Curated annotation (Swiss-Prot):
GO cellular component, as recorded: cytosol
Molecular function (Gene Ontology), one example: nuclease activity
InterPro entries: RNaseH-like_sf, YqgF, YqgF/RNaseH-like_dom, YqgF/RNaseH-like_dom_sf
Top-level EC class: hydrolase
UniProt xrefs under Pfam families: RuvX (PF03652)
Name recorded for this polypeptide: Putative pre-16S rRNA nuclease
Organism of derivation: Halalkalibacterium halodurans (strain ATCC BAA-125 / DSM 18197 / FERM 7344 / JCM 9153 / C-125) (Bacillus halodurans)
Keywords recorded for this protein, A-Z: Cytoplasm, Hydrolase, Nuclease, Ribosome biogenesis
GO biological process, one term: rRNA 5'-end processing
Family: Belongs to the YqgF nuclease family.
SMART domains, per the entry: YqgFc
Lineage, top ranks: Bacteria, Bacillati, Bacillota, Bacilli, Bacillales
Keyword Disulfide bond: no
Functional summary from the UniProt entry: Could be a nuclease involved in processing of the 5'-end of pre-16S rRNA.
């Protein structure tokens, strides 16, 4: 049983999946969202859930530094509510403060070009969101 991690943005969705034991997160893809057909986003995620036998989906919840939820966080919560109609999984919202910034710093320190960073940053953020969740589950 695997866990899927999502970094939901307005233009793309970074997607990561756990190994079967739930120890490590691997980047799966960066999905380009369709402006005209939001349903395609949910159907694509539903197909990944089936393909990878996912039981839990972790969605990054952008919070302000004071812990409050702003417009981006509200969009993520709305996305999660809609996704529940497409998948039979547990959906968990996970604090993602600074994950995109941390992912970008990691890629810069690895000397990844700006063009390549742009194509993988959301996937890396999804990996960081999912790995944070998996690490916390191991402590329980």
């Amino acid at each position: 049983m695997r866990t899927l991690g999502l970094d939901v943005g307005t233009k793309t969705i970074g997607i990561a999946v756990s190994d079967a034991l739930g120890w490590t997160a691997q980047g799966l893809e960066t999905w380009r969202r369709s402006d005209a057909n939001e349903q395609a986003d949910f159907e694509h995620i539903a197909s990944l859930v089936k393909e990878h036998e996912v039981t839990t989906i972790v969605i990054g919840l952008p919070k302000n530094m004071d812990g409050s939820i702003g417009p981006s966080g509200e969009r993520s919560e709305t996305f999660a509510a809609e996704l529940r109609r497409y998948v039979p999984c547990e959906i968990v919202m996970w604090d993602e403060r600074l994950t995109t910034t941390a992912a970008e710093r990691m890629l810069i320190s690895a000397d990844v070009s700006r063009k390549k960073r742009k194509s993988v940053i959301d996937k890396m953020a999804a990996v960081m969101i999912l790995q944070g969740y998996l690490d916390r589950q191991q402590l329980k």
